[in-house]
Design a protein with these regions (language model features):
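Residues forming the flavin
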Residues: 1-453
Length: 453
């Protein structure tokens, strides 16, 4: 039985890999980063258990569950790593692709980690002694990491990697402290890129998305005002493993913020600066974050600026209703026109039109969180050229029919799931991963039957 190739190690790619592996099929999971996990690994919490009993919940004080993302994701990452039918290729990407369904020849280029994965125990001693610091992508650049580092505490594989762009040995031919200090002699500065050839029956694309950079919208002050954050930066601040240990300290002065405003649709639902589509998950994650703030600090005030509330999932509207009625979250219908900073207090003055009241108003907040758009990954164009798949007008992977064939691309045997073909929330990404895995399994089984007959 030929294996299946899964490209992308986020929650969609992990779920697709596990679904296939549990059917007894071999899977090669390719991830460009040092660890699998994707964006979900960066999230503090996720509203996953939105039940249908929200009407009863208000009466019985049983509310929609807001779960820790790592408690959900980490077991799946470990299961994926330990599954005998799954081979994980981190820091890797597709370099060449040809063939047809049931007989795809793929070349995988694996970039050097400069650390022997078989020897490294993940002790972190090398990172402790490394003298070079750089902004941590995992911590949304709110904290630094070393030139040799483990991606994050729950990283899979739990192996260090060297950033060659800032490592003193690769930039100035000096240092090598990590090599001297490593008790397992795992550091290997001589590692070279490796090429792996695979023959697979099907391919599943789960390459995910990127977040819009709100610096393009200058009137919101992102990058100029320290207390204007993106939603991902906010997630890291309120996460227990984040740079502040889960305390919402303002970046300007370290004070705990108790008056927070969220701005929806930053970079989405616009024809000027950003993209015209809805990013699907912003309404719910802003509500989730607002509830978390009120739960942790009952004296706080939280406002959410929105154009329209799009609560399409099961129990989602009930969750928003509870946020309003029980947690006291204030929803303001209107898109802010400008955000200015008070030079003395560093508070933020939001100028907006309340479209329900029909008048221009202003609101003062200690922190403003911009809910940024989910946009196509920068590598989509390159990968589409290699595979021969189509992209839509925005740069997401296209499907042949979003209604009847929602996970099938124009190339037979190549399937998509998750946010690589448009913004999705976590439950929808997981559901699509199952659909893509089922399609890929059919290809593999059909090929096996044809060969035997």
């Amino acid at each position: 039985v030929k294996p299946v190739l899964v490209v992308g190690g986020g929650i969609a790619g992990i779920q697709a890999s596990l679904d296939l592996a549990d059917r007894g099929m071999k899977v090669h999971l390719v991830e460009r980063m040092p660890s699998i996990g994707g964006v979900m690994a960066q999230l503090a919490h996720q509203c996953l258990h939105a039940s249908a009993s929200c009407a009863i919940a208000a009466r019985e004080r049983e509310f929609t569950t807001i779960d820790c993302c790592n408690c959900i994701l980490t077991p799946k990452m470990i299961e994926c790593f330990r599954h005998p039918n799954i081979t994980i290729h981190t820091q890797s990407e597709i370099s060449k692709f040809e063939g047809s369904v049931g007989d795809f020849d793929v070349k995988i280029l694996k970039y050097p980690r400069s650390v022997d994965e078989k020897k490294c125990t993940g002790c972190g001693l090398c990172s402790d002694k490394c003298p070079v610091k750089n902004p941590s992508v995992f911590q949304a650049e709110l904290e630094t990491r070393k030139a040799i580092y483990i991606a994050f505490p729950q990283a899979v594989p739990q192996v260090a990697t060297i950033d060659r762009e800032i490592c003193l040995w690769f930039t100035n031919s000096e240092c090598r402290i990590c090599e001297k200090i490593c008790p397992m002699k795992a550091v290997d500065f001589e590692q070279k890129p490796k090429e792996l050839k695979l023959n697979v029956s099907s391919v599943i694309l789960a390459t995910g998305f990127e977040l819009y950079n709100p610096k393009e919208i200058g009137e919101y002050g992102y990058g100029r005002y320290k207390n204007v954050l993106t939603s991902l930066e906010f997630e890291r601040l309120v996460c227990a493993s984040g740079p502040t240990g889960g305390v919402l300290n303002r970046l300007s002065d370290g004070h705990i913020a108790k008056n927070i405003a969220f701005v929806q649709c930053v970079g989405s639902r616009t024809h000027t600066k950003g993209y015209p589509y809805c990013s699907a998950s912003c309404c719910m994650y802003a509500t989730k974050e607002a509830v978390l703030i009120r739960e942790h600090e009952p004296s706080s005030h939280v406002s959410i600026f929105y154009i329209d509330l799009r609560t399409f999932g099961k129990g989602y509207q009930g969750f928003v209703d509870l946020a309003k009625s029980h947690w006291g979250v204030k929803y303001i219908r209107g898109r802010p026109g400008e955000i200015r900073e008070d030079p003395l207090t560093k508070n933020l003055i939001i100028h907006y039109e309340d479209t329900e009241k029909g008048r221009v108003e202003r609101l003062e907040a200690e922190v403003v969180v911009l809910c940024t758009a989910a946009i196509p990954h920068r590598d989509n164009k390159k990968l589409a050229q290699i595979l021969g798949t189509r992209l839509d007008e925005f740069g997401f992977f296209d499907v042949i029919d979003p209604i009847l064939n929602p996970v099938e691309t124009n190339i037979k045997g190549i399937y998509v799931c998750g946010s690589c073909h448009g913004p999705r929330d976590i439950p929808e990404s997981i559901a699509e991963a199952g659909a893509a895995a089922a399609k890929a399994a059919v290809d593999t089984i059909r090929l096996t039957v044809e060969v035997k007959s």
